[in-house]
């Protein structure tokens, strides 16, 4: 069932109680499902909900960079056009030939990252974090230590390439003596980083793969499902802890049964997400709630389900201190 989930502490008032609330957007990883975030962002911006800071990893970092450069509908139109035109070969150039060749020569990755670099260049004119109108934090992971490494200044492209460098699929990014890879490896929904500054509410755009996203058909499906369980447990823990400090609003998303290499159907998914989140946000802003659970003082989450449930047919960079 699609709904908007809102987690707050016992002392938090309703959404209209603080019209100048300091707002963070957290954009998860998600690969080809990153297209859903465009519809989610459009629903937010149309309702005057603009971020004071954005935190993203992998596909969410790319979308976050474009949003932070132009936090308006025009900027989202540009980003949406990039996603709508994306094809598998744009991101994974060479296809099976490239994969086979890299396996035979014992490469550490299956695909070069030139395709990703081209997508980044088309998605935003920004070349540096200094070009952004809204502060952005890009989450990556240190392959050797497992530490999260967060970028917030310097050249933008290396940070985005590192954040999307899925281990074994794309080459690692070497920076400052570290080998950096996709931030989703350790933190698929980098919620906790939103609390490093003065923030009152956090909108979470979580489009990361879950274990139930698609049937288990191949060995890769088994690996992805197991990986998803581990990452989701991290997010649930972070969400429970963070909701003691800020209001957390998790946006719904449409169902997406595409394979991970399939970039078709982007326009339909953007439209479905826009409609779904628009209805949920209207209900959130109106305070139109259906039910409320126990408060957080008992260590439980507060969940609000909204009465209006839409029916959808989904067809040199320096790390932050």
Annotate each language-model stretch with its function.
Residues 1-57, 65-321:
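Patatin-like phospholipase
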């Amino acid at each position: 069932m699609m709904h908007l989930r809102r987690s707050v502490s016992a002392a938090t008032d309703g959404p209209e109680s603080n019209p100048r609330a300091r707002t963070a957007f957290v954009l998860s990883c998600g690969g080809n499902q990153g297209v859903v975030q465009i519809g989610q962002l459009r629903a937010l911006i149309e309702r005057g909900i603009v971020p004071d800071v954005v935190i993203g990893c992998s596909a969410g970092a790319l979308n976050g960079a474009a949003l932070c450069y132009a936090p308006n509908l025009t900027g989202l139109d540009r980003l949406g056009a990039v996603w709508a035109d994306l094809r598998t070969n744009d991101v994974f150039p060479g296809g099976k030939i490239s994969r086979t060749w890299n396996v035979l020569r014992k490469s550490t990755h299956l695909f070069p990252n030139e395709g990703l670099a081209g997508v980044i260049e088309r998605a935003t004119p920004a070349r540096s974090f200094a070009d952004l109108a809204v502060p952005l934090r890009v989450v990556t992971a240190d392959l050797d230590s497992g530490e999260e490494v967060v970028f917030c200044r310097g050249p933008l492209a290396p940070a985005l390439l590192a954040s999307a460098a899925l281990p074994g699929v794309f080459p690692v990014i070497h920076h400052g003596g570290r080998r950096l890879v996709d931030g989703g490896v350790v933190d698929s929904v980098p919620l906790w980083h939103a609390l490093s500054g003065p923030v009152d509410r956090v909108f979470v755009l979580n489009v990361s793969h879950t274990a139930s996203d698609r049937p288990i058909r191949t060995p890769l499906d088994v690996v992805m499902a197991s990986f998803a369980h581990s990452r989701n447990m991290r997010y649930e823990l972070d969400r429970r802890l963070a909701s003691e400090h800020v209001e957390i609003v998790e946006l719904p998303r449409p169902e997406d049964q595409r394979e991970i290499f399939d970039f078709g159907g982007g326009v339909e998914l953007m439209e479905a997400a826009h409609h779904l989140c628009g209805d949920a946000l209207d209900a959130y802003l109106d305070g139109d709630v259906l039910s409320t659970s126990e408060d957080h003082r008992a260590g439980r989450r507060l969940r609000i389900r909204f009465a209006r449930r839409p029916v959808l047919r989904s067809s040199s960079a320096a790390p932050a201190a």
